[in-house]
Amino acid sequence: MNGMSTGTLVLLRHGESEWNALNLFTGWVDVHLTDKGIAEGKRAGELLLEHNLLPDVLYTSLLRRAISTANIALDTADRHWIPVIRDWRLNERHYGALQGRNKAQVKEKYGDEQFMLWRRSYDTPPPPIEAGSEYSQDTDPRYANLDKVPLTECLKDVVVRLIPYWEDTISADLKAGKTVLITAHGNSLRALVKHLDGISDEDIAGLNIPTGIPLRYDLDENLKPLNPGGTYLDPEAAAAGAAAVANQGGK
């Protein structure tokens, strides 16, 4: 596709991480993929190949689990050579003082209502993390150019940091007709899908994005989806994965 023709967007949530497997709030903590997560990255690359969906450029966060998933997927799809742009604005939502804590234990201590407010409400952030504490990123060198490193975020904060980056940077590649792969995180991708599909602040609470399954959006010249909600390359696995995400916090 050339010129101002429709771009193709592929969203990919990183494969299962070590803290996903342990049911811990992760946020900006930089954890590794599990063996399952590595396999999910490989399967994502196989799906890209099967659907002849070959990215021209990759955008990722600054976090290892997204970077590793993208590297595995692109290597599998023989697209390891494409240009890569990494940016903190694609990072997972910062979970504040909840980072490193077990979701089931937080739910048990604070109750279902407070747990769901922190986890899924649009504008209620968890308590801020203490600067300098074990799971804070305020001294992390990768964020040295930020005026202020977040100590907590709600989904609204992710929207505020991400959508200008989408409009100012990523959109140019799509408007040029490129196939753009964004490999990121549950909440940064939820923020972008909210924007693309015009999902309300209330309804976004019900959107769950599974790990490791590419989600395709075909966009018109105004970057509006021609296929609202996107199209998962493996719909059955995506439905099962989204249900598993929704159930996090259970014992």
From Swiss-Prot:
Pfam families assigned to the protein according to its UniProt record, in alphabetical order: His_Phos_1 (PF00300)
Amino-acid positions noted as binding substrate in the UniProt annotation, renumbered to this chain: 13-20, 26-27, 65, 92-95, 103, 119-120, 186-187
Catalytic activity: (2R)-2-phosphoglycerate = (2R)-3-phosphoglycerate
Alphabetic keyword roster: Gluconeogenesis, Glycolysis, Isomerase
InterPro entries xrefs: His_Pase_superF_clade-1 (IPR013078), His_PPase_superfam (IPR029033), PG/BPGM_mutase_AS (IPR001345), Phosphogly_mut1 (IPR005952)
GO molecular function: phosphoglycerate mutase activity
GO BP annotations, alphabetical order: gluconeogenesis; glycolytic process
PROSITE patterns: PG_MUTASE (PS00175)
Positions marked as site (Transition state stabilizer): 185
Catalytic EC class: isomerase
Enzyme Commission no: 5.4.2.11
Catalytic residues as annotated in Swiss-Prot or TrEMBL: 14, 92
Pathway(s): Carbohydrate degradation; glycolysis; pyruvate from D-glyceraldehyde 3-phosphate: step 3/5
HAMAP family: PGAM_GpmA
Role according to the record: Catalyzes the interconversion of 2-phosphoglycerate and 3-phosphoglycerate.
Family indicated by similarity: Belongs to the phosphoglycerate mutase family. BPG-dependent PGAM subfamily.
The name this protein goes by in its record: 2,3-bisphosphoglycerate-dependent phosphoglycerate mutase
The species this protein was found in: Rhodococcus jostii (strain RHA1)
Lineage: Bacteria, Bacillati, Actinomycetota, Actinomycetes, Mycobacteriales
Gene: gpmA
